[in-house]
Design a protein with these regions (language model features):
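Short S/T/G/P-rich N-terminal loop/turn motif that feeds into the first structured element of a domain
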Residues: 1-74, 82-97
Length: 97
């Protein structure tokens, strides 16, 4: 079952987001799903919110997210955001272009 996950990063900005992406992709950047080391991502959006930065994603399954978390979790921790707890909900409907 697909899931929707939201990461809120209080006090963070685009600089942290860009640093995480650079580390997770070995500096290649993230412009297509193939740039990520783990499969299963359906959609990704990120941007500033009051007091921080938010990332919202749709994953094919919780297992796919958990596999990817093993890659980006340590990066977030290394960059000072070990306490990030995502909000995860089951997706009722996912429409992609």
């Amino acid at each position: 079952m697909a899931i929707i996950v939201t990461f809120d990063l209080p006090g963070a900005g685009q600089e942290l987001y860009d640093a995480v992406i650079a580390r997770v992709t070995d500096g290649r950047g993230f412009t297509q799903f193939a740039d990520l080391p783990n499969p299963g991502l359906v959609s990704h959006a990120a941007g500033p919110v009051d007091g921080g930065f938010r990332v919202t994603e749709v994953w094919e399954s919780l297992e796919a997210l958990e596999t990817h978390a093993k890659t980006f979790g340590p990066v977030l921790a290394d960059l000072g955001h070990a306490d990030v707890q995502p909000t995860i909900i089951p997706a009722h409907n996912v429409v992609v272009r």
